[in-house]
Protein backbone atom coordinates (compact mmCIF):
# COMPACT_ATOMS: atom_id res chain seq x y z
CA UNK A 1 0.00 0.00 0.00
CA UNK A 2 2.86 2.37 0.85
CA UNK A 3 4.44 1.72 -2.57
CA UNK A 4 1.16 2.58 -4.33
CA UNK A 5 0.85 5.76 -2.26
CA UNK A 6 4.30 6.86 -3.35
CA UNK A 7 3.52 6.11 -6.98
CA UNK A 8 0.27 8.06 -6.71
CA UNK A 9 2.08 11.01 -5.17
CA UNK A 10 4.70 10.99 -7.92
CA UNK A 11 1.95 10.79 -10.55
CA UNK A 12 0.12 13.74 -9.01
CA UNK A 13 3.32 15.82 -9.01
CA UNK A 14 3.84 14.97 -12.70
CA UNK A 15 0.25 15.92 -13.56
CA UNK A 16 0.62 19.18 -11.64
CA UNK A 17 3.78 19.98 -13.58
CA UNK A 18 1.95 19.42 -16.84
CA UNK A 19 -1.00 21.51 -15.67
CA UNK A 20 1.36 24.40 -14.89
CA UNK A 21 1.88 25.00 -18.62
CA UNK A 22 -0.32 27.70 -20.11
CA UNK A 23 -1.71 28.18 -23.63
CA UNK A 24 -2.11 31.69 -25.04
CA UNK A 25 -3.85 32.28 -28.39
CA UNK A 26 -3.54 35.38 -30.57
CA UNK A 27 -5.98 36.31 -33.34
CA UNK A 28 -5.89 38.97 -36.02
CA UNK A 29 -8.32 41.80 -36.71
CA UNK A 30 -11.84 41.63 -35.28
CA UNK A 31 -14.21 43.95 -37.15
CA UNK A 32 -17.79 44.17 -35.89
CA UNK A 33 -19.11 46.59 -38.49
CA UNK A 34 -19.84 46.79 -42.22
CA UNK A 35 -20.43 43.28 -43.60
CA UNK A 36 -19.92 41.71 -40.18
CA UNK A 37 -22.60 43.99 -38.73
CA UNK A 38 -25.01 42.73 -41.37
CA UNK A 39 -24.11 39.13 -40.49
CA UNK A 40 -24.69 39.85 -36.79
CA UNK A 41 -28.05 41.46 -37.51
CA UNK A 42 -29.13 38.35 -39.45
CA UNK A 43 -27.62 35.57 -37.34
CA UNK A 44 -26.34 37.01 -34.04
CA UNK A 45 -22.78 37.34 -32.72
CA UNK A 46 -22.52 33.66 -31.78
CA UNK A 47 -22.74 32.81 -35.48
CA UNK A 48 -19.24 34.27 -35.94
CA UNK A 49 -17.61 31.52 -33.87
CA UNK A 50 -17.26 28.13 -35.54
CA UNK A 51 -16.88 24.93 -33.55
CA UNK A 52 -13.22 24.69 -34.46
CA UNK A 53 -12.50 28.18 -33.18
CA UNK A 54 -14.39 27.51 -29.96
CA UNK A 55 -12.33 24.36 -29.45
CA UNK A 56 -9.05 26.27 -29.83
CA UNK A 57 -10.24 28.98 -27.46
CA UNK A 58 -11.34 26.43 -24.85
CA UNK A 59 -7.86 24.92 -24.91
CA UNK A 60 -6.33 28.27 -23.93
CA UNK A 61 -6.19 30.19 -20.69
CA UNK A 62 -5.67 33.51 -22.50
CA UNK A 63 -7.06 34.63 -25.88
CA UNK A 64 -5.94 37.99 -27.31
CA UNK A 65 -7.76 39.62 -30.23
CA UNK A 66 -7.24 42.90 -32.06
CA UNK A 67 -10.51 44.87 -31.93
CA UNK A 68 -10.53 46.81 -35.20
CA UNK A 69 -13.37 49.17 -34.24
CA UNK A 70 -14.62 51.16 -31.26
CA UNK A 71 -17.46 49.47 -29.37
CA UNK A 72 -19.51 52.44 -28.20
CA UNK A 73 -22.86 54.18 -28.47
CA UNK A 74 -20.98 57.45 -28.98
CA UNK A 75 -21.24 58.60 -32.59
CA UNK A 76 -18.56 61.24 -33.11
CA UNK A 77 -16.66 60.17 -36.23
CA UNK A 78 -13.28 61.63 -37.07
CA UNK A 79 -12.61 62.70 -40.64
CA UNK A 80 -11.06 59.66 -42.30
CA UNK A 81 -11.71 57.23 -45.13
CA UNK A 82 -12.89 54.16 -43.21
CA UNK A 83 -14.91 54.77 -40.04
CA UNK A 84 -16.21 51.89 -37.93
CA UNK A 85 -18.33 51.39 -34.82
CA UNK A 86 -19.64 48.29 -33.05
CA UNK A 87 -22.43 47.91 -30.50
CA UNK A 88 -21.00 47.50 -26.99
CA UNK A 89 -23.52 44.78 -26.09
CA UNK A 90 -21.82 42.50 -28.63
CA UNK A 91 -18.69 42.33 -26.47
CA UNK A 92 -20.37 39.90 -24.09
CA UNK A 93 -20.46 37.24 -26.80
CA UNK A 94 -16.72 37.64 -27.39
CA UNK A 95 -16.17 37.03 -23.69
CA UNK A 96 -18.56 34.05 -23.69
CA UNK A 97 -16.60 32.42 -26.52
CA UNK A 98 -13.31 32.77 -24.66
CA UNK A 99 -11.70 36.07 -25.64
CA UNK A 100 -9.96 37.46 -22.56
CA UNK A 101 -8.03 40.47 -23.92
CA UNK A 102 -8.69 43.00 -26.70
CA UNK A 103 -5.96 45.14 -28.23
CA UNK A 104 -6.88 48.75 -29.00
CA UNK A 105 -3.47 49.92 -30.24
CA UNK A 106 -4.63 50.20 -33.84
CA UNK A 107 -5.77 52.83 -36.34
CA UNK A 108 -9.53 52.28 -35.90
CA UNK A 109 -9.96 52.47 -32.12
CA UNK A 110 -10.13 56.26 -32.46
CA UNK A 111 -12.77 56.25 -35.23
CA UNK A 112 -15.31 57.83 -32.84
CA UNK A 113 -12.85 60.23 -31.23
CA UNK A 114 -11.20 60.26 -27.82
CA UNK A 115 -14.51 59.92 -25.98
CA UNK A 116 -15.41 56.94 -28.13
CA UNK A 117 -12.03 55.37 -27.40
CA UNK A 118 -12.35 55.68 -23.63
CA UNK A 119 -15.99 54.56 -23.72
CA UNK A 120 -14.86 51.49 -25.67
CA UNK A 121 -12.26 50.79 -23.01
CA UNK A 122 -14.90 51.02 -20.27
CA UNK A 123 -17.27 48.79 -22.23
CA UNK A 124 -14.57 46.15 -22.70
CA UNK A 125 -13.93 46.11 -18.96
CA UNK A 126 -17.67 45.92 -18.25
CA UNK A 127 -17.85 42.83 -20.48
CA UNK A 128 -15.21 41.12 -18.35
CA UNK A 129 -12.42 41.51 -20.93
CA UNK A 130 -9.06 43.22 -20.40
CA UNK A 131 -8.30 46.15 -22.75
CA UNK A 132 -4.77 46.56 -24.08
CA UNK A 133 -3.00 49.54 -25.59
CA UNK A 134 -5.29 52.46 -24.71
CA UNK A 135 -5.42 54.84 -21.78
CA UNK A 136 -5.94 58.35 -20.42
CA UNK A 137 -2.49 59.32 -21.74
CA UNK A 138 0.43 57.81 -23.62
CA UNK A 139 2.14 56.50 -20.49
CA UNK A 140 -0.97 54.54 -19.47
CA UNK A 141 -1.71 53.37 -23.01
CA UNK A 142 1.84 52.05 -23.50
CA UNK A 143 2.04 50.07 -20.26
CA UNK A 144 2.86 46.37 -20.78
CA UNK A 145 0.00 44.06 -19.82
CA UNK A 146 0.59 40.96 -17.71
CA UNK A 147 -1.22 38.14 -19.53
CA UNK A 148 -0.23 35.41 -17.07
CA UNK A 149 1.88 34.95 -13.94
CA UNK A 150 2.12 31.15 -13.91
CA UNK A 151 4.26 29.19 -14.67
CA UNK A 152 6.11 32.49 -15.21
CA UNK A 153 5.20 36.01 -16.17
CA UNK A 154 3.99 36.61 -19.72
CA UNK A 155 3.99 40.26 -20.77
CA UNK A 156 2.38 41.82 -23.84
CA UNK A 157 3.75 45.11 -25.13
CA UNK A 158 1.38 46.77 -27.68
CA UNK A 159 2.17 49.57 -30.11
CA UNK A 160 0.60 51.26 -33.14
CA UNK A 161 3.32 52.07 -35.68
CA UNK A 162 1.16 54.11 -38.09
CA UNK A 163 0.24 57.78 -38.31
CA UNK A 164 -3.44 58.39 -37.59
CA UNK A 165 -5.64 60.23 -40.11
CA UNK A 166 -6.72 63.69 -38.93
CA UNK A 167 -6.01 62.82 -35.31
CA UNK A 168 -3.57 64.83 -33.23
CA UNK A 169 -0.76 63.00 -31.47
CA UNK A 170 -1.20 64.30 -27.91
CA UNK A 171 0.59 62.31 -25.24
CA UNK A 172 -1.35 63.89 -22.35
CA UNK A 173 -4.82 63.08 -23.76
CA UNK A 174 -6.73 59.78 -24.16
CA UNK A 175 -4.94 57.82 -26.87
CA UNK A 176 -3.65 54.46 -28.03
CA UNK A 177 -0.08 53.25 -27.53
CA UNK A 178 1.95 55.00 -30.21
CA UNK A 179 5.29 55.80 -28.62
CA UNK A 180 8.40 56.32 -30.80
CA UNK A 181 10.42 53.22 -31.69
CA UNK A 182 13.38 54.17 -29.49
CA UNK A 183 11.02 54.51 -26.53
CA UNK A 184 9.46 51.13 -27.36
CA UNK A 185 12.89 49.49 -27.56
CA UNK A 186 13.84 50.98 -24.20
CA UNK A 187 10.57 49.75 -22.70
CA UNK A 188 11.23 46.17 -23.84
CA UNK A 189 14.85 46.38 -22.67
CA UNK A 190 13.83 47.64 -19.21
CA UNK A 191 11.17 44.97 -18.90
CA UNK A 192 13.69 42.25 -19.77
CA UNK A 193 16.16 43.56 -17.18
CA UNK A 194 13.45 43.76 -14.52
CA UNK A 195 11.97 40.31 -15.26
CA UNK A 196 14.71 38.12 -16.71
CA UNK A 197 12.70 34.86 -16.81
CA UNK A 198 9.52 36.36 -18.28
CA UNK A 199 8.09 35.76 -21.73
CA UNK A 200 7.80 39.10 -23.54
CA UNK A 201 5.49 39.35 -26.55
CA UNK A 202 5.42 42.50 -28.68
CA UNK A 203 2.27 43.21 -30.72
CA UNK A 204 2.64 45.85 -33.43
CA UNK A 205 -0.07 47.26 -35.69
CA UNK A 206 1.89 48.15 -38.81
CA UNK A 207 2.83 47.45 -42.42
CA UNK A 208 1.44 48.10 -45.88
CA UNK A 209 -2.18 47.04 -46.35
CA UNK A 210 -2.86 44.13 -48.71
CA UNK A 211 0.84 43.28 -49.04
CA UNK A 212 2.47 39.92 -48.39
CA UNK A 213 5.94 40.95 -47.21
CA UNK A 214 7.29 43.49 -44.74
CA UNK A 215 9.57 46.27 -45.90
CA UNK A 216 13.22 46.37 -44.86
CA UNK A 217 12.60 48.95 -42.12
CA UNK A 218 10.06 46.66 -40.48
CA UNK A 219 12.55 43.81 -40.48
CA UNK A 220 15.16 46.07 -38.91
CA UNK A 221 12.77 47.22 -36.17
CA UNK A 222 11.59 43.66 -35.51
CA UNK A 223 15.16 42.41 -35.16
CA UNK A 224 15.98 45.27 -32.81
CA UNK A 225 13.00 44.38 -30.61
CA UNK A 226 14.17 40.76 -30.42
CA UNK A 227 17.67 41.94 -29.50
CA UNK A 228 16.14 44.22 -26.84
CA UNK A 229 14.57 41.20 -25.15
CA UNK A 230 11.33 40.26 -26.90
CA UNK A 231 10.61 36.53 -27.23
CA UNK A 232 8.18 36.90 -30.14
CA UNK A 233 6.45 39.51 -32.28
CA UNK A 234 2.82 38.87 -33.22
CA UNK A 235 1.56 41.70 -35.42
CA UNK A 236 -1.35 42.80 -37.61
CA UNK A 237 -2.87 45.56 -39.79
CA UNK A 238 -2.14 44.49 -43.38
CA UNK A 239 -5.30 42.34 -43.69
CA UNK A 240 -3.05 39.65 -45.14
CA UNK A 241 -0.95 36.81 -43.81
CA UNK A 242 2.63 38.03 -44.14
CA UNK A 243 6.09 36.55 -43.67
CA UNK A 244 6.73 34.37 -40.62
CA UNK A 245 10.39 34.67 -39.72
CA UNK A 246 12.64 32.82 -37.29
CA UNK A 247 15.24 35.25 -35.96
CA UNK A 248 17.77 34.05 -33.39
CA UNK A 249 15.33 31.30 -32.47
CA UNK A 250 12.48 33.77 -31.90
CA UNK A 251 9.34 33.95 -34.05
CA UNK A 252 8.31 37.12 -35.88
CA UNK A 253 4.79 37.17 -37.33
CA UNK A 254 4.85 40.35 -39.40
CA UNK A 255 1.07 40.15 -39.83
CA UNK A 256 -1.33 37.37 -38.92
CA UNK A 257 -4.10 38.96 -40.99
CA UNK A 258 -7.82 39.21 -40.31
CA UNK A 259 -9.95 37.10 -37.97
CA UNK A 260 -13.60 38.13 -37.80
CA UNK A 261 -13.83 40.24 -40.93
CA UNK A 262 -15.66 40.76 -44.23
CA UNK A 263 -12.91 40.22 -46.82
CA UNK A 264 -13.77 40.60 -50.48
CA UNK A 265 -10.67 38.89 -51.90
CA UNK A 266 -9.05 35.50 -51.24
CA UNK A 267 -5.85 37.34 -50.33
CA UNK A 268 -7.61 38.78 -47.28
CA UNK A 269 -9.34 35.52 -46.32
CA UNK A 270 -6.16 33.53 -45.63
CA UNK A 271 -5.02 34.13 -42.09
CA UNK A 272 -3.80 32.38 -38.96
CA UNK A 273 -3.95 32.23 -35.21
CA UNK A 274 -0.85 31.82 -33.06
CA UNK A 275 -0.84 29.53 -30.04
CA UNK A 276 1.92 29.85 -27.48
CA UNK A 277 2.60 27.12 -24.96
CA UNK A 278 4.50 28.56 -22.02
CA UNK A 279 6.24 26.30 -19.53
CA UNK A 280 8.64 27.09 -16.70
CA UNK A 281 11.62 26.79 -19.02
CA UNK A 282 10.28 26.81 -22.59
CA UNK A 283 8.13 28.56 -25.16
CA UNK A 284 6.53 26.65 -28.03
CA UNK A 285 4.91 28.49 -30.94
CA UNK A 286 2.22 26.97 -33.15
CA UNK A 287 0.74 28.51 -36.30
CA UNK A 288 -2.92 27.57 -36.84
CA UNK A 289 -4.16 28.16 -40.43
CA UNK A 290 -7.53 29.90 -40.73
CA UNK A 291 -9.78 30.78 -43.65
CA UNK A 292 -12.54 33.37 -43.35
CA UNK A 293 -15.83 32.26 -44.93
CA UNK A 294 -18.72 34.72 -44.94
CA UNK A 295 -17.15 36.66 -42.07
CA UNK A 296 -16.64 33.48 -40.00
CA UNK A 297 -13.06 32.29 -39.25
CA UNK A 298 -12.72 28.56 -39.89
CA UNK A 299 -9.84 26.22 -39.05
CA UNK A 300 -8.24 24.67 -42.15
CA UNK A 301 -5.53 22.04 -42.64
CA UNK A 302 -3.06 24.26 -44.48
CA UNK A 303 -2.62 27.64 -46.09
What is each PLM-predicted segment?
Residues 4-15:
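Sec-dependent N-terminal signal peptides
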Residues 19-303:
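Acidic, metal/ion-coordinating pockets
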Amino acid sequence: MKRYSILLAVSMVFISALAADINIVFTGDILLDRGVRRAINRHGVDHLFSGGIDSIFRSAQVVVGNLECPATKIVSPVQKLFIFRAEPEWLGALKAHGITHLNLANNHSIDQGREGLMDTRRNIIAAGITPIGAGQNMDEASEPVLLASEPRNVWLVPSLRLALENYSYLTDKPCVSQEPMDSLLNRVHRLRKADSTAVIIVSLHWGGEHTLRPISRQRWDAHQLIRAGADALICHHTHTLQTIEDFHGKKIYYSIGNFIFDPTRPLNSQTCMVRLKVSETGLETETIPVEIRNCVPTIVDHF
